[in-house]
Each structure stands twice: as structure tokens, then as C-alpha cells.
């Protein structure tokens, strides 16, 4: 099979990369009705599989779970989760032939095996659904021409998909129809009904493409969402300890600092995050972020280039074929880092202290968010897609670090995201070491003293922060998410 994106000509590539339309709420007036009375079978009962299924059932849809015979016979976790929640569970052979919509919510590396197993069992004219398009775009999976292929991609972990639905809301969602597989022209109706059944239409839905979702998703998770947080955690911890900070305090400042900082980011973008600083600290954070952007631009561009060309995917799939040797080695090495093994700090760190003593961390967030956004947009991805794959998801990933450090982040994210995270962080850490050596007192671990500031300089910095394109599009998109709850757990 050939990488689907690479089979397209340049015009087709640009058209699919640039497909992005914010859908009006009136387009979801029929809710999930298009799928009511039809049989929906979900393959996979992980975080997305279970929580999407719960939402869809609560929206009036007929949901069942198809699992491998071994998973049922051995009563594995997927079987237990589905049965304990009252769902019908059966083998592929028992459930797939009757399904009107088969939703594949297994991990990326299992998609080819799953699709090749279920496709011969699917009835003529059925639909196949994904929540991430890697299998279609990067693997180039060929789907029977009578099958409609759609995607509904919530821009949050599965647990958030469920919690927001229970509150009567939802999470922002991308939907798409694979242009090679829409024989009856009903793909968009299916995708809209599925998105409505998960509650996504209440928070905002983007009509996108499989290509745009995959390329932007890979870029976001490799750089700002996971790679930058991992590299920043390791660099900042080592810097603090080297300068005499108690390792336990340093660990807590970083572990919970990302979450506290990005909670402000979630509520009001980079503008609000920077406004939490004193004026002297804001000017310093801005200067540091500009330095970081200059240093890291080639690295961000390399990741985007390798994602667009398919180089990243081919390398990762080669590691899949080699029993994840690289991935497992990097995972083990990360677990042995000083940050991961540092003792816990029993004292309390106040919310403002995370900002005052984390100027460098704020600069890293600002630089990483803006660079990821800019690099995606420069590659033809529309601003709304770039926003969701950079700034929007960052607080959710930071929340995983607050739970159990980098270990938890790498457990929660997909293997695809974890592999890309390691590629980025292993390159970024040595790249930034000279920069770290030149830091000034007050950049990290201590507060910058109050002092006089130049009014014109402060005005210009404020204007630069607020006029960035990600702040403009973010303000619009956050208007649809004002009901989302705070997710911070730091005390």
C-alpha cells in the first residue's frame, strides 16, 4: 500500500490540507437522527471507544461492541468495560455483518489488522468510521468502494468526551468524509449524526479532511503538545537542581506548573497567560520566547516536513515491525530521568507562585504554541485546524503530567504521539542546552523583581501578543467553549 497523501498531485494535496470550515449550529438541527434505528458497532473499548459509545447510547443510538474472540474468552479489560456498562458484546463474526456503521476505535498500529478482519464481514453499503485518519492517509488502507468512510475526531481524551457530555456540553470535534469512499453521498450526514451523538456539536465542529486532520494532529502532538512539554520538563528540572533548588520542590514546580500555566491559556489564550505576569516578567518572558522561536524554528520545520513527506510515518511503522524497539527504549530511558525519579514535595505552592517562578516555562509555552501554529499554517493547514492541534489541546496534556509526571502523559497519549514526542524531545534537549546556560536570575525558580518598565516597550509587546493570528482565531473559537469546566487538579 502507498501513502495516500503521496498519491495525490500538488493541487489535490493543497486542497485537502486546506479543507476546514466551521460549521453552523443550525447544521446539526437533526441531531443524531440519521443514525437512529441503525446498528452501530464499535471495535475497541479503550478510552475513546467506551466513552464515545456511552455518549452515543445516551443519544438514542443502538450501540454494541465487537471484540476479538480471545478478548471475550479471556475476559480482558475491553470485555469487562463493555459488559459492566451494559453493552451487547460479540465477536466480529457475530456483530459486523449486521452493522450499518462500524466504528474503528482501536490504537493506530492495530488499524490495518482490524480493518482487514472486519472489511470482508461488512455488508454492502455499510459505513466505516475512524477518530484518527492515520490508517487511511499514512498507511494508505484501501477500503471497498461500496463502503462509506467517515471520521469524527474529538479534540480531547475520551474521559473529557464523556464528562463534557454528562454536563450537557461537548468537546470541539473535527469531522470528515474520505473522498475516495462516499458512494451514496451520505458520508457527511453520517459524520454529523455521529458527532451530534457524542455532543461535539455543542462545542463547535470543523468540517475537515482526513489529510488535514492527520497532518495537523501529528504536528501538534510531536511538538508543542507532548515533545515541548517533555523537553521543557527535563531541561527545567535539571537547571533548577544544578543551581541548588531542592529536587522535590523543583519537581513539583514543573509537574504542576505546566497545568497551572496552561489553565490560563485555556481561558484566555496567550494574552491571559502573559497577563498573569508582572510587567517586568512579561517583558522578559516575551524576550525569551522570541529567542526560543529563533532557535527552534528549524526543528519545528523538520518535523512538519517529515510529516508532510511521510518520512515520519514510514520510520515509525518500521519500528512497529521491529516490535517497537525504539519506542520501548525511549520509554525506559525517560522513566529513568532525574525528573521522573525525583522525590515528591509535600509543601504547598500557591497558584501565582507557578507564574512568578516559571517565567521560562511560560516563554516555552508561548514559543511552542506559536511555532506549531505558524509552521502548520505555512504548510497549508487552515488556522482553525492549527489552533485545535496546538493551543486548545495543551491544557489537557499538561493535566496528565500533573497526575503522574511524564509517565502518565506517555501512557495516556497514543503510541503514535509517544513515538513523535521522543523524536522531538531527543532533538530539542541538546538544541536548547546552550540557551539554558545563558539564563538570568529570575527566569526560573525565583521571581523577577518589580521595577520600572518602558511604557512604549510594554505597549509594543502587548500589541504583538494580542495581534498574533492564533490569538485572533482563538478568541473566536473559545466563544463556543466558554462552558467548559476548569480541569486543573493542582492545589
UniProtKB/Swiss-Prot annotation:
Pathway terms, separated by semicolons: Amino-acid biosynthesis; L-isoleucine biosynthesis; L-isoleucine from 2-oxobutanoate: step 2/4; Amino-acid biosynthesis; L-valine biosynthesis; L-valine from pyruvate: step 2/4
Domain KARI C-terminal knotted: 209-344, 345-484
Binding residues annotated for Mg(2+) 2, in chain numbering: 217, 389, 393
Residue ranges of the TM segments: none
EC number(s) per entry: 1.1.1.86
Binding locations of substrate: 414
Pfam families recorded: KARI_C (PF01450), KARI_N (PF07991)
Positions annotated to bind NADP(+): 45-48, 68, 76, 78, 108-110, 158
GO BP term, pick one: L-valine biosynthetic process
Active-site feature positions: 132
Record has DNA repair as a keyword: no
Family matches, as PANTHER family: KETOL-ACID REDUCTOISOMERASE, MITOCHONDRIAL
UniProt xrefs under HAMAP family: IlvC (MF_00435)
Name assigned to this protein: Ketol-acid reductoisomerase (NADP(+))
The organism of origin for this protein: Salmonella heidelberg (strain SL476)
Organism ancestry: Bacteria, Pseudomonadati, Pseudomonadota, Gammaproteobacteria, Enterobacterales
Gene from which the chain derives: ilvC
Amino acid at each position: 500500500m502507498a501513502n495516500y497523501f503521496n498519491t495525490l498531485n500538488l493541487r489535490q494535496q493543497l486542497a485537502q490540507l486546506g479543507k476546514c470550515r466551521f460549521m453552523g449550529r443550525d447544521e446539526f438541527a437533526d441531531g443524531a437522527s440519521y443514525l437512529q434505528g441503525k446498528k452501530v458497532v464499535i471495535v475497541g473499548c479503550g478510552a475513546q471507544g467506551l466513552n464515545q459509545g456511552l455518549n452515543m447510547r445516551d443519544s438514542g443510538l443502538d450501540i454494541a461492541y465487537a471484540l476479538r474472540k480471545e478478548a471475550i474468552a479471556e475476559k480482558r479489560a475491553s470485555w469487562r468495560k463493555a459488559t459492566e456498562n451494559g453493552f451487547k458484546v460479540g465477536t466480529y463474526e457475530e456483530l459486523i455483518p449486521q452493522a450499518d456503521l462500524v466504528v474503528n476505535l482501536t490504537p493506530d498500529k492495530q488499524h490495518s489488522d482490524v480493518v482487514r478482519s472486519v472489511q470482508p464481514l461488512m455488508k454492502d453499503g455499510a459505513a466505516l468510521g475512524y477518530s484518527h485518519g492515520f490508517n487511511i492517509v499514512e498507511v494508505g488502507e484501501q477500503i471497498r468502494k461500496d463502503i462509506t468512510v467517515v471520521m469524527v475526531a474529538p479534540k480531547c481524551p475520551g474521559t473529557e468526551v464523556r464528562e463534557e457530555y454528562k454536563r450537557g456540553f461537548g468537546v470541539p470535534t473535527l469531522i470528515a468524509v474520505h473522498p475516495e469512499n462516499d458512494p451514496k453521498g451520505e458520508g457527511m450526514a453520517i459524520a454529523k449524526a455521529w458527532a451530534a451523538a457524542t455532543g461535539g456539536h455543542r462545542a463547535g465542529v470543523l468540517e475537515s479532511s482526513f489529510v488535514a486532520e492527520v497532518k495537523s494532529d501529528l504536528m501538534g502532538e510531536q511538538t508543542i503538545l507532548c515533545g515541548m512539554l517533555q523537553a521543557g520538563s527535563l531541561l527545567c528540572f535539571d537547571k533548577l537542581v544544578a543551581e541548588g533548588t531542592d529536587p522535590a520542590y523543583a519537581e513539583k514546580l514543573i509537574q504542576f506548573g505546566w497545568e497551572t500555566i496552561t489553565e490560563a491559556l485555556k481561558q484566555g489564550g496567550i494574552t491571559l497567560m502573559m497577563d498573569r505576569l508582572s510587567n517586568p516578567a512579561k517583558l522578559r518572558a516575551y524576550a525569551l520566547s522570541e529567542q526560543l522561536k529563533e532557535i527552534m524554528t528549524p526543528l519545528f520545520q523538520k518535523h512538519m516536513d517529515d510529516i508532510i513527506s511521510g518520512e515520519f510515518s514510514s520510520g515509525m511503522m518500521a519500528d512497529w515491525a521491529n516490535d517497537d524497539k525504539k519506542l520501548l527504549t525511549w520509554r525506559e530511558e525517560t522513566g529513568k530521568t532525574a525528573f521522573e525519579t525525583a522525590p515528591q514535595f509535600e509543601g504547598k505552592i500557591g497558584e501565582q507562585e507557578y507564574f512568578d517562578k516559571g517565567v521560562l516555562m511560560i516563554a516555552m509555552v508561548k514559543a511552542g504554541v506559536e511555532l506549531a501554529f505558524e509552521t502548520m499554517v505555512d504548510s497549508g493547514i487552515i488556522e482553525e485546524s492549527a489552533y485545535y492541534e496546538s493551543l486548545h489541546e495543551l491544557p489537557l496534556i499538561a493535566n496528565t503530567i500533573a497526575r503522574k509526571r511524564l509517565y502518565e502523559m506517555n501512557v495516556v497519549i497514543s503510541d503514535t504521539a509517544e513515538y513523535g514526542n521522543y523524536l522531538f524531545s531527543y532533538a530539542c534537549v541538546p538544541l536548547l542546552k546552550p540557551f539554558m546556560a545563558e539564563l538570568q536570575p529570575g527566569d526560573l525558580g525565583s521571581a523577577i523583581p518589580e521595577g520600572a518598565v518602558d511604557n512604549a516597550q510594554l505597549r509594543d509587546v502587548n500589541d504583538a501578543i494580542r495581534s498574533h493570528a492564533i490569538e485572533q482565531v482563538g478568541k473566536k473559537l473559545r466563544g463556543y467553549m466558554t462552558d467548559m469546566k476548569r480541569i486543573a487538579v493542582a492545589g
